From Swiss-Prot:
The lineage of its organism: Bacteria, Bacillati, Actinomycetota, Rubrobacteria, Rubrobacterales. The keyword Nucleotide-binding applies. GO terms for molecular function: ATP binding; GTP binding. It comes from the Bacteria. The keyword ATP-binding applies. This is Nucleotide-binding protein Rxyl_2009. Keywords: ATP-binding, GTP-binding, Nucleotide-binding. Belongs to the RapZ-like family. Displays ATPase and GTPase activities. GTP binds at D75, I76, R77, G78.
Length: 305
């Protein structure tokens, strides 16, 4: 997996304080997300009872040295102990003066969650009788209302602990007021990412997989890149998509959007989508997008084949 920032730029930190509530499925990476926010300078609290969130906000705002950003993790256990209290608190936070609220929801597919629990050898908090799959499905149903309310939904399927921390490091930076644009290449045979805002399918382009000389390579290799971009449709596609994104991105930034994710998919996620995502990043990073943004590229399935 690859994640890089070809042309990051910086803007001043936002003036309003941030309250970030992280919730989602058990095993989806909430602890790693919390560490990423902590590394970014946020004041972080794990498993805080929801009714105490306004008190923490009040104490932070009342102190001259109080943190500019507070992050709270709430999981299924808190929901079972305190019922729908988190939703009520979020409703109250919406109107808090001087604060900007973000509700982040983490999820992953069943196979990823099961694998993580097997590797950690820890019990699922919602499991009864050791049936992890049923616990995951039950939790998914129970947390569906919170997912619908989330400002950002992040799918961590297939990501390592380090990848999750990197992902949330970018997100933590984006909440300071900059717009973070992420270009994600992927393979449809591995499933489309769930957390993209816009998705482009490049399977209409000739597939380098069928060229024996190119098959072992990836879209980051010059030979594959040249083969993909040699096709007139590929060049026109890149130009049209760059034009669309160049129009959209400054307008999203002006509206206060802080995170914009673009998916580029081919069959396996190793050749066409990688080459196109890299070319889009190169073009957009070369002055095609107005405003100040952070631009990242991630190749989700580069090593999957």
């Amino acid at each position: 997996m690859s994640e890089e920032a070809p042309h990051p730029t910086r803007t001043p930190a936002a003036q309003r304080r941030q309250i970030v509530v992280i919730t989602g499925l058990s095993g989806a990476g909430k602890s790693n997300a919390l560490r990423a926010f902590e590394d970014a300078g946020y004041f972080c609290i794990d498993n805080l009872p929801p009714r105490m969130i306004p008190e923490v906000m009040e104490m932070s705002a009342g102190s001259p040295a109080g943190p500019e950003g507070v992050v709270v993790v709430a999981d299924i256990r808190g929901r079972r102990y305190f019922g729908g209290e988190l939703e009520r608190v979020i409703d109250g936070v919406e109107g808090a003066g001087g604060w900007e609220k973000r509700l982040l929801f983490l999820e992953a597919d069943d196979a990823t969650l099961i694998r993580r629990y097997k590797e950690s050898r820890r019990p699922h908090p919602a499991a009864r009788g050791g049936d992890v799959l049923e616990a995951i499905r039950s939790e998914r149903r129970e947390l569906a209302p919170l997912r619908e309310r989330a400002d950002v939904v992040v799918d961590t399927s297939g990501l390592s602990a380090l990848d999750v921390r990197l992902r949330f490091k970018r997100l933590a930076e984006s909440l300071s007021g900059r717009l973070t644009v992420s270009l994600i290449s992927f393979g449809f045979k591995h499933g489309a990412p769930l957390d993209v805002d816009t998705l482009f399918d490049v399977r209409f382009l000739p597939n380098p997989h069928y060229d024996p000389a190119l098959r072992p390579l990836t879209g980051r290799d010059p030979a594959v890149r040249e083969a993909v971009l040699a096709h007139p449709d590929a060049r026109e596609f890149v130009e049209r998509v760059c034009g669309l994104l160049s129009f959209l991105i400054p307008r999203y930034a002006a509206e206060g959007k802080t995170y914009f994710t673009v998916g580029v998919g081919c069959t396996g996620g190793r050749h066409r989508s990688v080459a196109i995502a890299e070319e889009l990043a190169r073009r957009l990073g070369a002055g095609r997008i107005g405003g100040e943004v952070d631009l990242y590229v991630r190749h989700r399935d580069l090593e999957s084949g």
